[in-house]
Design a protein with these regions (language model features):
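Conserved P-loop NTPase "ATPase switch" module shared by AAA+ and STAND
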Residues: 133-152
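Short amphipathic recognition helices of helix-turn-helix/homeodomain-type DNA-binding modules
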Residues: 1-31
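Conserved ATPase-coupling elements of RecA-like P-loop NTPase cores
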Residues: 147-157, 178-179
Length: 214
């Protein structure tokens, strides 16, 4: 009888830890030892500014679960997404980073889970991984980076968006039917100048030339 009692109490503790009964909120299981080799990439050391954009992302995700970060190539979409995640890390039980390669199901299958085995084919891995993802809630952030296709061209995106976790998606595409925030050029007078000095500190001696360059 003792093993049964132990299992019962373990289940009760787990249920209580994953649910906030005072607010009705549901919490995700901690996947830090489930998904392996999925550390959030660090921001570029030269990253500056974008405080307003990061605040706008936080404001949106407090009310809606999906947001696209759009903008031209090289403007800093991925860096903003990573900066948001790092700034708000304490809000989340899990932060999952997924680099889109053109097939969302394959990208999910190619995540490394602790219980993967060499006998599993791609479809089995996908099914196992996605079952775990379906148990996640709004305290999990999934960053889908490099999603440079229209949503209609990725069949699995709508299915992924049905889940309860938060999705932050970077894309070069201009989208009309989805909530998005566009990343624009840095402020010339302040942020671009600061970025220039980070790459070329000696230029501080000649601010007029720097101003002419940028």
């Amino acid at each position: 009888q003792e093993p049964d009692n132990a299992a019962f109490f373990c289940s009760v503790v787990r249920y209580a830890s994953l649910n906030d009964h005072s607010t009705g909120a549901l919490y995700s299981p901690d996947l830090s030892e489930v998904i392996l080799c999925n550390k959030l990439p660090s921001c570029n050391q030269a990253f500056i500014g974008r405080k307003d954009e990061i605040k706008a992302i936080a404001s949106h995700l407090s009310n809606q679960s999906v947001l696209f970060i759009t903008g031209m190539a090289g403007i800093g979409k991925s860096e903003v997404a990573k900066a948001y995640a790092q700034t708000n890390r304490k809000k989340y039980t899990n932060i999952i980073y997924l680099y889109y390669t053109g097939d969302l199901r394959k990208d999910i299958a190619n995540l490394t889970f602790a219980d993967d085995s060499v006998e599993m084919n791609e479809e089995v891995r996908f099914q196992n991984h996605y079952k775990v993802m379906q148990r996640l809630h709004t305290d999990t952030l999934l960053i889908l980076d490099n999603f440079n296709v229209l949503p209609k061209d990725e069949p699995f995106l709508k299915e992924l968006m049905k889940n309860n976790m938060q999705l932050l998606i970077t894309s070069r595409c201009k989208l009309k039917n989805y909530d998005s925030i566009e990343i624009k050029e840095l402020d010339k007078e302040k942020e671009l100048t600061e970025l220039f000095y980070k790459h070329c500190p000696s230029a501080k001696r000649d601010p007029d030339s720097v101003s002419a360059i940028i």
